[in-house]
Amino acid sequence: MNILKGKTMVVTGANTGIGRVTAEKLAAQGAHVVLACRDLGRTQPVLDAIARAGGQASFVALDLADLDAVRVAAEKVARHGPIHALINNAGLANVPGVTKQGFEMTFGVNHLGPYLFTALLWPNILAGAPSRVINVASRAHTRIKTFPWEQFQGVHTSPGGFQQYCYSKLANVLFTRGLARRVKPDVVATACLHPGGVATEVFRNQTWLVRTITGWFTMTPEQGATSTLATATMPREQLQHGAYYNEHAKVTPMNPLALDDALVEELWKKSAAWTGVPEDWAGRP
């Protein structure tokens, strides 16, 4: 199957779990996959597996906890030319602390880093049109009732718990809606998704008990990649622009907060200011 031959697709966090499965499956369909990950050593087995299967893949170092590193990574990815799909898959949970630029760690890695990465690669994504931006969110975003801005920027520390993860996942959904308000789906289609309860390294910093329980009741990465792969490759007319998909690749209701256009725009403007990009990098809503 070479239905993606000639396409370049970028997958962040592709060295393990859902990201690895996503990268391998896309490469198997003929795409050249750029694996944007923190560490080459941990990504090399994926590169080797793709090569053995006859696929094409490249590595670019990406540290989403450092916006300067994100800029360097985006510059390197941009050298690959037009991008036909960007899959913002990388994420973390339960990691205390702050990013290099002083943002709450989970919010910085799960939202601000991907926001900047997408903005910097936007010319390449437009050059690949019709193209896609797929954001891996989580059902956890539905737990949030308010969005406490003071917890995200200018903090000195953070507990990095599950609540912070939920905030960051709501930000993923809000970002998806903001992007959908700015670009037509026949140019760049976008969607976000819940991959299911997947035993991945996102939760590698949980206690042994939580990891054990999670292992009992979760899907495999192969099952968890279903929605990511579907939204990245389904026919354009079938993808609902700006929608939130469940683990079975079905459109499902999102948190009502994510339907608040004022909140969508507030996050967009703050994210642009915090990452140093123009508010109109993707156009105006």
Predicted feature locations:
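The beta1-alpha1 cofactor-binding region of Rossmann-like NAD(H)/NADP(H)-dependent oxidoreductases
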Residues: 40, 60-75, 100
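C-terminal helical subdomain
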Residues: 168, 212-252, 260-265, 269, ...
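Canonical Rossmann dinucleotide-binding motif of NAD(H)/NADP(H)-dependent dehydrogenases/reductases
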Residues: 1-34
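Conserved hydrophobic beta-strands of the Rossmann-like cofactor-binding core
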Residues: 8-11, 86-87, 133
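Catalytic loop of short-chain dehydrogenase/reductase
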Residues: 91-100, 104-107, 126-187, 194-213, ...
